[in-house]
Amino acid sequence: MSRLPSLSRLCLAIACSALLGGCVAAGDVRPFAELAPIVPVVAPVAQPTAGAIYAAGPSLNLYGDRRARDVGDLLTVNLVESTTASSTANTSISKKDATTMGAPTLLGAPLTVGGLNVLENSTSGDRSFAGKGNTAQSNRMQGSVTVTVMQRLPNGNLVIQGQKNLRLTQGDELVQVQGIVRAADIAPDNTVPSSKVADARIAYGGRGAIAQSNAMGWLSRFFNSRLSPY
């Protein structure tokens, strides 16, 4: 049996690698955002009193509500997110050129060869370009995530952070929420809408069969990248 040329063997190796690569399971479609670990808040140890009626330490407001206000308190964020965006672009360019040069004459007689005006010339050019693009996107998210107050700023605003991890039959779903909440925006039931969260970072992602089914393969990603010649 004759040996295959080097180029043919190289093409065969690339084809085999592509087939094997298609069988490899894709990784996480959307890597989860990195959140700093939630550090447990340790309550300060009560200092023994010297017999006085009042002592310095945590206080309890008997007539106040249970809204989050201190580091370590829990707060429920109601996710009410809805965004819609659309864009349309149309471009059309056209250019035409035409040039005609008559046959020169010598002493009033045209210069001909075999009865033809060989020096008579005309040129024309036509260029055109047309492009059209449309894009539309709509996102909607509803739900709730209970977060932890990580820091209380000098002006009373609360830095919050939390996540919810759901393990389903065909994969995992994760919702993460970070941001800054104004204490005045917290409702009496200790909830706040996501539209009231400043510097909000809301991430939603998944792992598993459902997430992988919505991801393009490596070959499709190549033809949709800048490296594609088409």
From Swiss-Prot:
Domain of life: Bacteria
Membrane topology: Lipid-anchor
InterPro entries: Flag_Lring (IPR000527)
The keyword Signal appears for this protein: yes
One GO term describing the cellular component: bacterial-type flagellum basal body, distal rod, L ring
Pfam families: FlgH
Signal peptide residue numbers: 1-15
Lipid-substituted positions (N-palmitoyl cysteine): C16
Claim: Signal is one of the keywords in the record: yes
Principal localisation: membrane
General function of this protein: Assembles around the rod to form the L-ring and probably protects the motor/basal body from shearing forces during rotation.
HAMAP family: FlgH (MF_00415)
Name of the protein described by the UniProt record: Flagellar L-ring protein
